[in-house]
Amino acid sequence: CALPISIFLSPDGKSYKANREIAVSGLKFEKSGEELPLEKVHTPGCKTIDEVAGFLGVKPENTGKAVFYSDEKGNLIFVLIRGDFEVNESKLQNHLGLLEINFANDEQIRKAGAVPGYASPVGIDPSKARIVIDKSVAGSSNLVVGANEADYHYKNFNYGRDLKDADVVDIATVRNGD
């Protein structure tokens, strides 16, 4: 059953409202500053965005969050989104042209060469997972992401240098004020 799509534009054209399945953020993501060298750092026991950010003294928006899904045929989908955002599964499904996606299990994640809790797009075999990057990641500089090794993360991940050829799309859930 499809959800009704609602879009409301203000008469002055300066604002709009839309349901979350289609809402587009007004935030602009532009890389700033010099791309620093990719650096592997020890992050013992830090698996969540809050744990990693706290341990390294960075804000969640300076991290990348890996989320894994599988499609109806069991194909793996690796999603990377900025750590302060959530994946909008409706947008992801629409982009992929899928009716259904489910969270992948740890075995599926490991088969692609990733480590649950420490997953990274760096080193993922693209033949084993479709990689989808949110525009928030593509437009950010020097993010902290997993290193595909327990208790380690990379600092200074930059899309375009450390990963290329992923689908870059808007798959973030729009928050109030975005």
Located regions from the model:
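Extended, low-hydrophobicity, polar/charged segments
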Residues: 2-178
